[in-house]
Amino acid sequence: MSDTITTRTYSADAKSRDVRPRESERDETQQDETQVCPECSGHLVTDEEHGETICEDCGLVVEDTVVDRGPEWRAFDSAERDSKSRVGAPTTKMMHDKGLSTNIGWQNKDAYGKSLSPRQREQMQRLRTWNERFRTRDSKERNLKQALGEIDRMASALGLPENVRETASVIYRRALNDDLLPGRSIEGVATSALYASARMAGTPRSLDELEKVSRVDKMELTRTYRYIVRELKLEIKPADPEQYVPRFASELGLSDEAERQARQLLRDAKETGIHSGKSPVGLAAAAVYAAALLTNEKVTQSEVSTVADISEVTIRNRYKELLEVQDGTLLA
């Protein structure tokens, strides 16, 4: 009896497997048929303005009730599109509430643009106060709000793109959820998260640059950064001097040829191994300075020092080493 049941089950499964391909083939055939004209087998096009599907060859109107699922309004630029859109912005990790809460504007005006009376202004101020309290209900949310504000402020000062800010916010959230903050300052962890994020995105900034815009010193930043990377197991490659070249060249107003020359100098230095143990910022600055001289562009060591935020002595030392490598490459 059991053998008979098993056989029947197998047959049913086999039958279902045979049916599914046939059904999919039938669906594909029907889909292909709907894309051609039933009269002349010509190509069909959709006229979205009139809501019709017509044949290009014979002009037959195949369907005249096509639904336009787009907005009923038109916009000619991004600003106009944003102003007419009736949906909110996408959620973001850069805000402590991910942008889902309501924010009461600071303008004391009604919907018609008229100024509020003194009594109404007092009421609105109380509403703003209570709204702010509800947005940060506990210490964890207040911590997150302060940290993400710091990340946004520092990223703006350093000219870092939005994707770096988003990644830094995610890193800080992970540190907060893993309870890594006790014994460390909010500013220190936030700065470390931004430093790590910038390196991961290939747009690194030096520790000296982070120290200038942060409220923590370089020693605390270094210590906290190593702790965060170790505990969160972040995969961060050593900083590449070439990643600093585009920014330095842009701020100094150098040509594309000078930038290419600087990259080539750094590649030659890597092949010889002289970059090992040296600051990537110093090497990049020296390469940019050397490339400017090789392409006959006027740049002083002082200008490069200001842009790269390193001493002129470091630039001179690395510059000599790069030229030695360049001379050896040309002789070879």
From Swiss-Prot:
A zinc finger (TFIIB-type) spans 33-63. GO terms for cellular component: transcription preinitiation complex. One of its GO terms (biological process) is transcription preinitiation complex assembly. Keywords: Metal-binding, Repeat, Transcription, Transcription regulation, Zinc, Zinc-finger. Zn(2+) binds at residues 37, 40, 55, 58. Residues 1-36, 77-106 are annotated as: Disordered. Residues 1-10 have a biased composition (Polar residues). SMART domains: CYCLIN. Residues 14-29 have a biased composition (Basic and acidic residues). The keyword Metal-binding applies. Sequence repeats lie at residues 149-232, 243-324. Induction: By heat shock (60 degrees Celsius), with a 2-fold increase (at protein level). One of its GO terms (molecular function) is DNA-binding transcription factor activity. It comes from the Archaea. There are 6-12 TFIIB paralogs in this organism. NCBIfam families: PRK00423.1. PANTHER family: TRANSCRIPTION INITIATION FACTOR IIB, TRANSCRIPTION INITIATION FACTOR IIB-RELATED. Stabilizes TBP binding to an archaeal box-A promoter. Also responsible for recruiting RNA polymerase II to the pre-initiation complex (DNA-TBP-TFIIB). Belongs to the TFIIB family. This is Transcription initiation factor IIB 2. The gene is tfb2.
